[in-house]
């Protein structure tokens, strides 16, 4: 039996307290993590040895059960990713671990220098060598292969080199059993906390530019760069978490605290950089149209996961499957209705809409259909010339598969899957027909959906 030298752990499985956590949970996690480490490729002896140390600490210090449970949970979810060989999964594994540390201890400094810290440090060693180097290079190369940007390209080589050198240096220094003041000085000289800032700063600049762009290709580039930015910030934090633990090992607590503070500041800066995504203004609707619907894009889903970690407020209220009333912001007594005109079905603004009359249905790919529920089944679609036609087809096609872009003032903008940069608006005419306008149509294209 894997834990035969700790039989008492199994005898007291039912012991539970809010402070200490369930022993049954930590037992299960210990077994899963140990099995995963033994099955993983590569050299995991150090991690297995550290796991044994963690078991011993749980035996002698019951108050560590709760902390160990949370850390083992984050490590367990990360192990398969760290050994996957896939850059995106590896960085997602990094996120699992740093998020686990942040929620359990408030940061690496709070971990102390006990068995939990040693175990986490040994797990970080699984990727801070060649995996970190290869992952950083892979996500940078992937983003730049899709978007030509000479300024970013110039800084990319330096960023890849910085990550590679720093991770390799930390790995070597972790092999030292006793760190001297001289060793700590060498570490500080070779892994300064400000490394990687140039490239991350360049990405912040591109994100800022792309936020207000009127070019669909630039908006797509900005969203891809947002994902790259999130990945690099997390990789940087992961390296510095390992660095902070290393300083604690050398009893340089003031330096470890400084590193942790640098991480905290950079996490706040990342939140500031990404905050606009969930508080869009109309001029940022195009990047919002690339980002939404989040469930339709693997890139957007990954970004959302990172924003939660950085502390960015959630996306505003999502649209559900039910009837809504779409009221125009410019003519706030007019809402969308339909009419028959010369054999065609048209959508327009009407002043006599009292009840929700547009049925919104979410499709499996995350987009929506908008169907008039007052008369025969009509889907709103964008015609090639911009008209909001009604179609009787069961599936209106990507001309009628809609996305809703939430704005910070509670209104929405609407565009189709085929033309993400053409937004639904109510035209200035006696008929008030519903049409589409390229980029921000102003308040005529802002809708209150109730």
From Swiss-Prot:
The keyword Transport applies. GO terms for cellular component: extracellular region; membrane; nematocyst; other organism cell membrane. The lineage of its organism: Eukaryota, Metazoa, Cnidaria, Cubozoa, Carybdeida. It comes from the Eukaryota. Keywords: Cytolysis, Disulfide bond, Hemolysis, Ion transport, Membrane, Nematocyst, Secreted, Signal, Target cell membrane, Target membrane, Toxin, Transmembrane, Transport. It comes from Carybdea rastonii. One of its GO terms (biological process) is monoatomic ion transport. Belongs to the jellyfish toxin family. Type II subfamily. Contains disulfide bonds. Residues 1-18 form the signal peptide. CrTX-A and CrTX-B are encoded by the same gene. However, they differ by their molecular masses (43 and 46 kDa, respectively). In addition, CrTX-A is primarily localized in nematocysts, whereas CrTX-B is only detected in the tentacle without nematocyst. The keyword Secreted applies. GO terms for molecular function: toxin activity. This is Toxin CrTX-A. It is found in: Secreted; Nematocyst; Target cell membrane. Oligomer. It is suggested that CrTX-B is synthesized in the tentacle, is modified (become CrTX-A) and then migrates to the nematocyst. Its main location: secreted. Has potent hemolytic activity. Is lethal to mice and crayfish. Causes cutaneous inflammation in humans. May act as a pore-forming toxin, disrupting normal transmembrane ion concentration gradients in susceptible cells.
